[in-house]
């Protein structure tokens, strides 16, 4: 039986891979991804994204706008208290339109990861030249409004992309892509030429929107899931020696609500309670992987691919 497989990845079972390790003997890398999003008041191109059915739609728009007006600042206090380095999944229009949010992130040295211009402008079906200009604009916005820094990675707007996305990301200087949630380690993504791009595990499970907004679980459930997930990863890493990655994905308009502060702080306190946990940015995790594991893992993946092709 033949199915259409993704040509960016090679299937490799965890037990057969070369080891991935983290600095100072730590075994689980955890990155916090606050999604600081901006939405068009009237969605471009029509459609019914984010559950919105008619325009204008103050209910859904204002709920999300609350995140940047008030809830962001409450979340910031929790992050500051526990000194959690953060990788902001950012609607890049925030850099220009919300200078207070931008400056607060810059003062703390937060990494910004592209999450598009608006979270109502996905990349699906975008022509090559238009997507190329999208990355050019993304880097221009970061360089202009965020201290000359360039963006190293992306979580696509609405977690969207095209067949050209990986190659264009490399063309514009990016090294990691968070859309690929297929693993518990960074993995090499095949691209044109000799560009190096890796997937880094984001999370749709340890994520406040599906858990708290969509499913209406209590905040305590988010805490319990985060602890259980990372506890199990720590145990697995102790048993097989493989370093792992977990992501805590938050949104100010959800986790920045007053009732959530105690739960967010409980998660952050847990991350600081175990020396085996490396709390880092997505770029730090990617850079370490590229320097220490990428070449060996890519060679191993290519060997598996060649052997399978020879058997075919």
Model regions: which residues?
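A conserved mid-domain beta-alpha-beta active-site/ligand-binding segment of alpha/beta enzyme cores
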Residues: 201-234
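Catalytic alpha-helical scaffold of carbohydrate-active enzymes acting on polysaccharides/glycoconjugates
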Residues: 2-198, 223-248, 254-312
């Amino acid at each position: 039986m033949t199915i259409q497989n993704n040509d960016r990845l090679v299937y490799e079972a965890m037990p057969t891979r070369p080891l991935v390790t983290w600095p100072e003997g730590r075994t689980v890398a955890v990155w916090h991804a606050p999604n600081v999003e901006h939405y068009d008041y009237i969605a471009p191109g029509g459609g019914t994204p984010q559950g919105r059915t008619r325009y204008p739609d103050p209910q859904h728009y204002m709920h999300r706008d609350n995140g940047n007006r008030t809830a962001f600042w409450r979340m910031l206090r929790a992050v500051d208290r526990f000194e959690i380095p953060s990788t902001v999944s950012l609607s890049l229009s925030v850099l220009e339109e919300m200078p207070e949010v931008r400056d607060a992130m810059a003062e703390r040295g937060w990494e910004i990861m592209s999450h598009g211009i608006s979270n109502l402008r996905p990349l699906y079906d975008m022509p090559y030249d238009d997507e190329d200009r999208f990355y050019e604009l993304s880097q221009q916005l970061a360089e202009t409004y965020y201290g000359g820094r360039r963006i190293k990675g992306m979580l696509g707007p609405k977690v969207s992309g095209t067949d050209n996305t990986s190659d264009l990301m490399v063309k514009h200087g990016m090294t990691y892509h968070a859309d690929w949630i297929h693993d518990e380690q960074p993995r090499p993504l095949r691209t044109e030429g000799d560009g190096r791009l890796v997937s880094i595990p984001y999370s749709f499970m340890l994520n406040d929107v599906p858990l708290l907004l969509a499913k209406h679980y209590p905040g305590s459930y988010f805490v319990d899931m985060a602890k259980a997930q990372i506890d199990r990863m720590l145990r697995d890493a102790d048993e097989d020696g493989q370093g792992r990655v977990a992501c805590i994905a938050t949104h100010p308009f959800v986790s920045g609500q007053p009732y959530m502060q105690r739960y967010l702080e409980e998660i952050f306190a847990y991350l600081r309670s175990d020396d085996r946990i490396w709390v880092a940015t997505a770029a730090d995790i990617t850079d370490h992987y590229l320097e220490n594991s990428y070449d060996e893992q890519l060679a191993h993946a290519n060997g598996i691919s060649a052997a399978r092709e020879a058997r075919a």
